[in-house]
């Protein structure tokens, strides 16, 4: 792998008004025909193997091509953009495609894929997925929803996450719940027996029977995690037929109503959104809260190294656990939330089949596991559970079962703006300025006045 400057980098710098570009290149052995593919990737120290695995995949695909007797070989050049986040990166790339330029392949957050599809910049790949089951056949079926637009599939899921409700078993025991009840909570949640309001009831009992200050905590800023609660009440935020943002007043009011009840019953702090992230983590991991609505990566990033929770699987589950996001009503569907980063192929690529095959090879189980275990992400394939490295990273292996029921953010580029409105309304509910119904009305009024093509029901 070597650093080079290319015409692509110069083009991007000119189009985007400056910046820096790092290009990594894979060079094939001499062949009659070299197909050069350029990959756009955000410069992201938290996920360096996303582009690096594509570079590695070139060698694997070239071997496949040689074995097939083909005279074609692929070479990969990676442009790493300096964008601070995936939203900014997607907007920059849309501008580059908009002036008739751009890469052959790109990496993006999944909710942006339909923006590229709508502008004609992303290649539909359904037929290639069906043609090459050796590349795509064992990717978890649920993950394909994250790269689907109204008329087809336009990307390949590169990784996944799991979000859940962590809970403190020690506090539940102190509150009088027996081990049979505590250990059955995950299964009862998945079966639809344990509901969102049951979580409030459990948290309320913990506060009344123990010294814990908090019942349920969630992130203090805008993000995906609390969206799980909205999805439990049936809010999917996208119209399946058109991909437009969808707001359903009754379902929004029901979800905000859960937070409202949590605050009124004293289990969700009214100042949750004013607290520091570290203070919320500390409260949960030091035994001062019953539930923590967050994601699996927090164990390896904070719980184990910072707060000393046991790394051993058996010792961890003796006193800690997690459940999926419960259903709103008994018999309903529990859920989880994941936010995949994805690979995609540009519509203008000259060798679309080779491009898709390359990304298929970049999604090989061993390469994806390299990324998963070094970044605390879930793998995308069932066979990764058999990799000793993945099995050793037991939080990932255990949380993978949630991919069967996982849900996603809406594949709409305006969802980030909508989420900001939802978060503002959530602050209003928790501080007592808005009722659940008023919060729903606020979200709909703000979204319809500031966003485009919002469907309201």
Question: Positions of the model-derived regions?
Answer:
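Conserved N-terminal structural module of periplasmic/extracytoplasmic solute-binding proteins
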Residues: 5, 14-118, 130-133, 175, ...
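A structural signal for short loop-to-beta-strand junctions that line the ligand-binding cleft
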Residues: 95, 103-104, 134-172, 214, ...
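Hinge/lid segment of periplasmic solute-binding proteins
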Residues: 108-164, 197-198, 317-326, 389, ...
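Extracytoplasmic/periplasmic solute-binding protein
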Residues: 150-159, 163-165, 191-245, 251, ...
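Glycine-centered hinge/linker elements that transmit conformational signals in sensory
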Residues: 198-205, 241-277, 321, 325, ...
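Long, aromatic- and glycine/proline-rich binding clefts that accommodate carbohydrate-like moieties
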Residues: 318-327, 372-428, 453-457
């Amino acid at each position: 792998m070597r650093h080079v400057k290319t015409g692509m980098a110069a083009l991007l710098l000119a189009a985007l008004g400056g910046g820096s570009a790092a290009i990594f290149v894979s060079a094939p052995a001499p062949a009659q025909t070299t197909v050069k593919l350029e990959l756009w990737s955000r410069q992201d120290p938290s996920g360096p193997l996303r582009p690096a695995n594509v570079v590695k995949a070139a060698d694997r695909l070239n071997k496949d091509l040689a074995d097939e007797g083909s005279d074609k070989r692929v070479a990969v050049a990676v442009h790493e953009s300096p964008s601070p986040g995936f939203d900014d990166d997607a907007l920059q790339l849309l501008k580059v495609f908009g002036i008739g330029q751009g890469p052959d392949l790109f990496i993006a957050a999944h909710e942006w894929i339909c923006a590229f599809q709508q502008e004609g910049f992303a290649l539909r790949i359904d037929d290639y997925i069906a043609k090459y089951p050796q590349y795509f056949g064992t990717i978890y079926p649920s993950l394909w929803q994250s790269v689907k637009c109204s008329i087809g599939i336009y990307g390949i899921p590169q990784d996944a996450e799991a979000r859940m409700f962590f809970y403190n078993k020690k506090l539940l025991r102190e509150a009088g719940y027996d081990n049979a009840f505590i250990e059955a909570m995950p299964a009862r949640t998945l079966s639809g027996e344990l509901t969102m309001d049951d979580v409030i009831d459990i948290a309320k009992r913990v506060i009344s029977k123990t010294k814990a200050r908090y019942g349920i905590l969630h992130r203090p800023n805008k993000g995906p995690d609390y969206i799980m609660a909205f999805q439990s009440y049936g809010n999917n935020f996208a119209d399946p037929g058109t991909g437009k943002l969808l707001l359903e007043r009754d379902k929004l009011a029901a979800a905000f109503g859960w937070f409202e009840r949590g605050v009124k019953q004293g289990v969700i702090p009214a100042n949750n959104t004013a607290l520091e992230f570290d203070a919320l983590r500390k409260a949960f991991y030091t035994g001062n809260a019953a539930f923590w609505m967050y994601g699996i990566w927090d164990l390896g990033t904070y719980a184990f190294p910072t707060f000393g929770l046991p790394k051993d699987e058996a010792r961890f589950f003796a006193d800690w656990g997690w459940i999926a996001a419960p259903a709103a009503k008994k018999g309903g569907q529990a859920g989880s939330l994941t936010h995949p980063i994805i690979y995609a192929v540009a519509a203008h690529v000259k060798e679309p089949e080779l491009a898709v095959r390359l990304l298929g090879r970049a999604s090989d189980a061993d390469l994806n596991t390299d990324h998963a275990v070094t970044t605390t992400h879930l793998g995308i394939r069932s066979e990764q559970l058999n990799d000793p490295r993945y099995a050793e990273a037991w939080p990932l292996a255990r949380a993978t079962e949630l991919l069967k029921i996982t849900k996603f953010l809406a594949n709409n580029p305006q969802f980030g703006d909508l989420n900001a409105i939802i978060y503002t309304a959530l602050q209003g509910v928790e501080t007592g300025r808005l009722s659940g119904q008023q919060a729903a009305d606020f979200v709909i009024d703000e979204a319809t006045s500031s966003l485009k093509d919002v469907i309201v029901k």
